[in-house]
Amino acid sequence: MGFDFSTSKSKAKRQKRIEVRFASPLMGIDLSLKLEAEEKKKEIEGSKHSRENKEDEEHDASGDEDEQMVKEDEDDSSSLGLRTREEENEREELLQLQIQMESVKEENTRLRKLVEQTLEDYRHLEMKFPVIDKTKKMDLEMFLGVQGKRCVDITSKARKRGAERSPSMEREIGLSLSLEKKQKQEESKEAVQSHHQRYNSSSLDMNMPRIISSSQGNRKARVSVRARCETATMNDGCQWRKYGQKTAKGNPCPRAYYRCTVAPGCPVRKQVQRCLEDMSILITTYEGTHNHPLPVGATAMASTASTSPFLLLDSSDNLSHPSYYQTPQAIDSSLITYPQNSSYNNRTIRSLNFDGPSRGDHVSSSQNRLNWMM
């Protein structure tokens, strides 16, 4: 059996229509009121839903704004933190720079004090230097026996000595101390030999040239010769052997000591030293009297030296001539010229007279030039 639902539904609709037609007008009013109430409810519910949606939207919007505000606050706080850190770093750098500036200022003050101290020391030394220089000059004058006008400029001469000093001379300076003792022994031997020599002098040949003493107080004959010479010694015609050397006070150039070896037991000694004022001048001092005939090359100069005990020679041939038997008692200008040609006859001698061997004003003799023949 089959059930027809469509017919049943149509029947139900028909019945409702019939009921509606025969219903009273009051029933129609009630139905309309119900419909209106339902519509109002729906409207109210819709308005509520719309309000709720609006509130939700507003709430969401406010939440977004709050989040944005929070984010902005966080950004502001982070930026403030960065600014504070940068400011702190800048402050630390400024403090370090200030500390460095203070240390530099302290160093500058120290350096200024040192500079001021050095300037004061320099001024004191500059004030003391002339006094020291004067005292040195006075000591040198007392040592050389020179008065008044014979002042020596220590500074300029020291520079010249340093420039003109040869390496051999510098090597010889170091031997001075070890040879002083030997020199004293030689001087004692010389005193004994001179004592014997005085007794034997009468038996010697009268034609043999003798050495004239430069002062009456000395026992030995002593003659001083100054010659311009570049070598360590000048060739004076005799044979010599070096036995000592030392540096004298007031003259940095060493003084060399020689003895005559022409004959055994000859008491003649010579001392050789550079001049303090002019390093090109070689000062030779001869002491004693030869106990043998002189060589041919030495006789002429021996006779010349006997007439003028203090001589300055200016020779272009480095004094290949003769013998001189002397050292400087007083140092100053006397001049003999020797041309290279040995046959040249005219010689000029300018001699000086002195009051003593170690002191004196330099007074020229009345006969300044003596002409003599070879």
Curated annotation (Swiss-Prot):
UniProt biased composition (Basic and acidic residues): 40-62, 161-193
Induction remarks: Induced by potassium deprivation.
Main localization (coarse): nucleus
Pfam families to which the protein is assigned, alphabetical: WRKY (PF03106)
Record keywords, A-Z: Coiled coil, DNA-binding, Nucleus, Transcription, Transcription regulation
Positions in coiled-coil regions: 87-121
Subcellular location: Nucleus
GO molecular function: DNA-binding transcription factor activity; sequence-specific DNA binding
Extent of Acidic residues compositional bias: 63-77
Sequence ranges of Polar residues compositional bias: 363-374
Region (Disordered): 40-90, 157-201, 355-374
Keyword match GTP-binding: no
GO cellular component, one term: nucleus
UniProt xrefs under InterPro entries: WRKY_dom (IPR003657), WRKY_dom_sf (IPR036576), WRKY_plant (IPR044810)
Top-rank lineage group of the source organism: Eukaryota
DNA-binding segment(s): 229-295
PANTHER family found in the cross-reference section: WRKY TRANSCRIPTION FACTOR 36-RELATED, WRKY TRANSCRIPTION FACTOR 9-RELATED
Functional note: Transcription factor. Interacts specifically with the W box (5'-(T)TGAC[CT]-3'), a frequently occurring elicitor-responsive cis-acting element.
UniProt protein name: Probable WRKY transcription factor 9
Natural source organism: Arabidopsis thaliana
